[in-house]
Amino acid sequence: MLRTTASRKIVLRRGLASINTGTTVASKKASHKFRNTFWTIALSATAFYAGGIIYSQKNDKFGDFFSNNVPFAEDLLETYEHYHDRPTLFLEDSWDGLKAKSNDLLSGLTGSSQTRRSNRENIEVKKILSLEPLNIETENSDPQLKEIIGSLNDLINSLNDSNLSIPESEFNSIKKSNQNMLTNLSQLNETLKEALSNYMIQRTSEVITELNTQYENSKREFEKNLQKNLLQEVDEFKENLTKQKDKELEEKLKANEELLQAKHANEVGLLSITQVKEFNKIIKDKIEKERNGRLAHLEEINSEVNDLSKSIDRSSKILSKNEALVQLTFQVDEIKSRINNNNLPDVNIDKELSRLKLLSNLLSTFNKKSCCDDGDCCSCKKGNKNEGKEGKISCKCKPKTNPPSLLSVVYDELESTCSGKKILSNEQIYNRWNLLADDFKTASLLPPNSGILGQLTAKVFSLFLFTKTGNPSNATDFDSVYARVGDNLRVSNLNDAVEEVVSLKGWPHKVCESWIEDARRKLEVQRLVEILDCEIRTL
């Protein structure tokens, strides 16, 4: 199939367009004013909105004016602030979108150009799209403006690398739009720089004014504080100097006064000594006359008063001793009543023992003997050779060690027996004895030197035994002993019950050790309290 002349021309034109010579011969084509106008308006609007958004971030007043009076400005500001925290993602999305749009535009332009080439007979001259990058000085510009210029330069480089062949009219329109965008961005950059410099100058002047104000205020305050401190130090120095001089003057006056008083005292002393000597002679003569007269029996009265004071001391000691004995008797009766009270399961008599100790110590002070054999203390004797210059008599007798009294011995035994321990009542001792019935049954079945098997066997067979009660016999088997002890405890015959239990040997005695200890403590306390009562009654 033969190709037509038009198709040959199209093929030839494509071959020439693939060669990067910059121009190609084509038939004349109609200009696209609407498309060029659209590109110019779009790029201008983009530059206007981009500049308004960037300057709104620097100046709040301009931002309010821009968002309130320019259409779609508020939405664009919100979108910018939304993507401001993630600029990398925003740039990637913008670049992908611009690349896709440019590819679509290029494909559309290519398709439409091919269609128009096939349908048109008139061929016009085409040029390869080659745009100049935006050479704008961004050294001191806003970072966001730098990003926008960089993105636009990347887009221009991408369009240049694609080697698009477009008609000359469109090429001129795009180039003009590129120049307009470059001019607008340059103006925007200069505007931003000027606004930033004005803002920095204004802010610097404000900061300098504020610092000057602070400096003047701090200077005035420092001068005021310095003046105040200096005045205060001067006042303190003046006050201290005044006090020091007053103190020195007062000391000098006091020293002169003391010197004058000492001189006057010496003169008066010399005069008074002679007068006192004469006065003493007169008084001595009068005293001798009175002593030989009305005061002749003064020594006899003094001896009788001493005898009366001794009698009062002896009476006081006797009364105190009787009161101590009464209190001791009361405490002993209190201990007896508590020990014999069956309503109390156990008794602690530590408080009563402390009172007994106090009363016994008080009573022992009344029973002390004199240091001399004749019953009189050396200090009571007159005319003794050991009498000193001051009338005191030093005793030369050897100290006597009195043997401990029965009262103190009984108290010590009571304290060692009952200190920190509880005394059981007769009923409690009887109940504890009844609790030993099962152990007694087991012990009655144990063979001599029984082992674990013997213990278990005796424990099992003891369950089939009965406890022996009633009138006890004189037999020595365990049941009879248990019955006799229970009968003695029932009639409160604790002494015989303890003797029966103590006579046991072997395992039964081992079982009853705790019970024997409690019962013996009860018996010992009863006997010691009885001895204490008898001793108190003999005093």
From Swiss-Prot:
Q: Which residues form a coiled coil?
A: 172-267
- Which residue interval is the transit peptide? 1-16
Membrane-traversing stretches: 37-56
GO CC terms of this entry:
MICOS complex
The residues exposed to the Mitochondrial intermembrane compartment are 57-539
Location within or outside the cell: Mitochondrion inner membrane
> Keywords assigned by UniProt?
Coiled coil, Membrane, Mitochondrion, Mitochondrion inner membrane, Transit peptide, Transmembrane, Transmembrane helix
Topological domain (Mitochondrial matrix) residues are 17-36
**Predominant cellular place of this UniProt entry's protein:** mitochondrion
Coiled coil listed as a keyword: yes
> According to the UniProt entry, where is the signal peptide?
none
Q: How does it sit in the membrane?
A: Single-pass membrane protein
Gene Ontology terms describing biological process: cristae formation
Q: Which PANTHER family match?
A: MICOS COMPLEX SUBUNIT MIC60 (PTHR15415:SF7), MITOFILIN (PTHR15415)
Describe, as the record does, how this protein assembles with itself and its partners. Component of the mitochondrial contact site and cristae organizing system (MICOS) complex.
Function description: Component of the MICOS complex, a large protein complex of the mitochondrial inner membrane that plays crucial roles in the maintenance of crista junctions, inner membrane architecture, and formation of contact sites to the outer membrane. Plays a role in keeping cristae membranes connected to the inner boundary membrane. Also promotes protein import via the mitochondrial intermembrane space assembly (MIA) pathway.
Q: Which family does it belong to?
A: Belongs to the MICOS complex subunit Mic60 family.
**Which protein are we looking at?**
MICOS complex subunit MIC60
Q: List the source organism.
A: Saccharomyces cerevisiae (strain AWRI1631)
